[in-house]
Design a protein with these regions (language model features):
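A contiguous loop/helix-start segment that scaffolds small-molecule binding in enzyme catalytic cores
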Residues: 2, 162-229
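Conserved helicase motor
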Residues: 61-69, 142-148
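Acidic beta-strand-to-loop metal/phosphate-binding motif
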Residues: 31-32, 86-94, 168-173
Length: 229
């Protein structure tokens, strides 16, 4: 059985009992980041003392985007042997801007059973923090790195707003690039409301709200989720 397991997006106290039970019951954990996976298992042992791995041979296997195609046949073989395999990303829900799509696509084709163990996402958390109406929203993944691609996407979103004025957009951006993105946005002639959500659920969580033009000179570090209306 394959389990797609969400993990905390920053605060390990958000770890659920169901997530913990699933992981310690696994034969194999496919981890985008093995170091994060080991930290997570240590957190489970501290927070859920009655839970112990069902096997001392629990494997943690590195499974990141660039290696997904290469490792897929072995994972499918494990599943057909009846192994319990859990997929986790570094944080949040796998497949959402994280590895796992090829695996899920293949198990559906092969009629191998799988289920999702849900949990927090930076997307929904940021939308609530933003204070913006969320009747309709679209998630864009990571914003483009190249200036030309940024400008092209900003113009596309601006056009979408003409047809769907209530739509809000959510995307990930790095602290190193966010200022450039905001300045390009301000220069596009579109000055929307937005929220910049930094280090969500962590000790130094910070939410900045305002117009794009009001936030272009701020300095940001860490992991950033942006909500734009």
């Amino acid at each position: 059985m394959l389990y797609i397991v969400a993990t905390p997006i920053g605060n390990l106290d958000d770890l659920s009992l169901r997530q913990a039970k699933t992981l310690v019951s696994s034969d194999i954990i496919l981890a985008e980041d093995t170091r994060s996976a080991n930290i997570l298992l240590e957190a489970i042992q501290k927070r859920f003392k009655d839970l112990q791995p069902k096997t001392t041979d629990l494997k943690i296997v590195s499974y990141y985007k660039e290696k997904e195609f290469e490792k897929l046949p072995q994972v499918i073989e494990w599943l057909k042997e009846g192994k319990n395999v859990s997929l986790i990303s570094e944080s949040g829900v796998p497949l959402i801007s994280d590895p796992g799509y090829l695996l899920v696509k293949t198990v559906i084709k092969e009629k191998i059973p799988f289920t999702v163990i849900p949990g927090a996402t930076a997307i929904s958390t940021a939308i609530v923090h933003s204070g913006l109406p969320a009747k309709e929203f679209a998630f864009l993944g990571f914003f483009p790195k190249r200036e030309s691609e940024k400008i092209k996407l900003i113009n596309k979103l601006k056009a979408i707003k003409e047809f769907l004025p209530e739509m809000i957009f959510v995307f990930f951006e790095s602290g190193q690039r966010i200022n450039e993105t905001l300045k390009l946005w301000a220069g596009s002639g579109w000055n929307p409301d937005l929220a910049i959500c930094r280090e969500l659920t962590k000790k130094f969580e910070e939410i900045l709200r305002g117009k794009v033009s009001e936030l272009t000179d701020k300095q940001f570090k860490g992991e950033i989720t942006v909500v734009v209306r």
